[in-house]
UniProtKB/Swiss-Prot annotation:
A Pfam family per the record: SPOUT_MTase
InterPro entries given in the database record: Alpha/beta_knot_MTases, RlmH-like, tRNA_m1G_MTases_N
Keyword field contains Cytoplasm: yes
Keyword Phosphoprotein: no
Positions of transmembrane segments: none
Location of the protein in the cell: Cytoplasm
Binding residues for S-adenosyl-L-methionine: L78, G109, L128, S129, P130, L131, T132, L133
Source organism per UniProt: Psychrobacter sp. (strain PRwf-1)
Functional note: Specifically methylates the pseudouridine at position 1915 (m3Psi1915) in 23S rRNA.
Record protein name field: Ribosomal RNA large subunit methyltransferase H
Amino acid sequence: MKLRILSVGSKMPKWIDTGFNEYHKRIQPMLTTEMVDLAAAKRAKNPSEANLAQYREQEGKAILATHQSNSREKLWVLDVKGKMLSTEQLADKLSEAMQVGDDVALVIGGADGVSPEVLAAADFKWSLSPLTLPHPLVRVVLMEQLYRAMSINNNHPYHRGN
């Protein structure tokens, strides 16, 4: 299984890159992962709701163009209205995808969310938390949770949950 993280935005603070890279390095023996940075739409200073919809549409087109929909790559989208999973449930979901031979493209949308087209194309909508998290921090939290889930699946002692 290969997991690609499609993330809108780039030029993360050094501490974000450091945290992300630490878990990215740790997970590689268990799961091949790749970060794909997608350009964020250029934003106006005081955008209208119509502008925000345009940004989501532009970023959504980039996400869908990058997603390998003609392959076995499933599209998982982070969305505040998505299904919340425990770490153990995430481990099960990753295990299921591996067993059937699916690859996964996991989407971190832009600062204004994801387009309706991306949500409609999603095979799974996942909510990391009901909290509003800073966009860059999601990268670190996501990679740590993926590593923790894969540690469970590989009987690695990192996860000490129940």
